[in-house]
Amino acid sequence: MLEVVTVRIPRRFGFHPIRDIQVLTPMNRGGLGAHALNEDLRGRLNAAAEPRLTRFGSTFAPGDKVIQMVNNYDREVFNGDIGFVREIDLEEGRMNMDFDGRCVTCEFGELDEVSLAYAVSIHKSQGSEYPVVVIPLVMQHYTLLERNLLYTAITRGKKLVVIVGQPRALALAVRNRRASRRITGLAQRLRTFKAGSEENH
């Protein structure tokens, strides 16, 4: 999965691994949860950045991709906004971030409002769109594998969507209509996509 995000998609399609590619995962915890994937992806994409700052269980460095976790009307950044760490000022106790070309400054004591965003939960991605979405699906996530969650993840991608994982987990997600019956045609679209991709290989 890490190689798909950091090497294969950028090399084959020309997308930037940090700016363009968003990993969306069903869970926050576990080996393929957002927390572990954020550390793994940062290790591949931004390992050498300094200085590093750890607050509220998260470590930040210049160049890191971050997500705003709550609405902050004073700073005009809102839940789900994606930005990038510009600078960490250890003397002043502030971290400067770039949200859509706008500099937003956060005091170290307020960094519980921000989290790493190389990978985010599918739930957290609702309402957002990204050029490329990569979705890890494994049976470890079985309690959350539902058709509406898969639909949400797939529809976040504007140009390319890549599902990485176990076919059994994908089949379970497509079959499982526990939460909603309003989504139609997803199973057929995935079968058509799979048939088309097999013909191209």
Which sequence ranges carry the predicted segments?
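C-terminal accessory regions
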Residues: 79-201
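Conserved helicase motor core of P-loop NTPases
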Residues: 1-75, 86, 95
